[in-house]
């Protein structure tokens, strides 16, 4: 078992996080608000297409 797999399993046990990004499968940095379940990187790429607006 590699270190990255072990870290992912340990993170799931520690946080109770069972979801993964629906786009790329990443387990960390998830945006779960509104049941989106995208990692933060994927969310940044598709947020405008989903109707989110960026305010500065």
Swiss-Prot record:
Residues annotated for Zn(2+) binding in this entry: 21, 24, 39, 42
Gene Ontology BP, a term: cytoplasmic translation
Keyword line: Metal-binding, Ribonucleoprotein, Ribosomal protein, RNA-binding, rRNA-binding, Zinc
Record-linked InterPro entries: Ribosomal_uS14, Ribosomal_uS14_arc, Ribosomal_uS14_CS, RIbosomal_uS14_euk_arc, Ribosomal_uS14_sf
GO cellular component: cytosolic small ribosomal subunit
Coiled-coil segments on the chain, per record: none
Cross-referenced PROSITE patterns: RIBOSOMAL_S14 (PS00527)
Pfam family, one: Ribosomal_S14
Cofactor note: Binds 1 zinc ion per subunit.
Top-level lineage group: Archaea
Cofactor(s) of this protein: Zn(2+)
Cysteine-cysteine disulfides: none
Any one Gene Ontology molecular-function term assigned to this protein's record: zinc ion binding
Subunit structure as annotated in this protein's UniProt entry: Part of the 30S ribosomal subunit.
Function statement: Binds 16S rRNA, required for the assembly of 30S particles.
Family of this protein: Belongs to the universal ribosomal protein uS14 family. Zinc-binding uS14 subfamily.
Protein name per the record: Small ribosomal subunit protein uS14A
Gene (name only): rps14a
């Amino acid at each position: 078992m590699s270190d990255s797999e072990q870290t992912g399993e340990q993170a799931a046990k520690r946080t109770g996080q069972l979801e993964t990004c629906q786009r790329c499968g990443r387990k960390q940095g998830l945006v779960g608000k509104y049941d989106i379940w995208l990692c933060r990187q994927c969310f940044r790429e598709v947020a405008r297409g989903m109707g989110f607006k960026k305010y500065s």
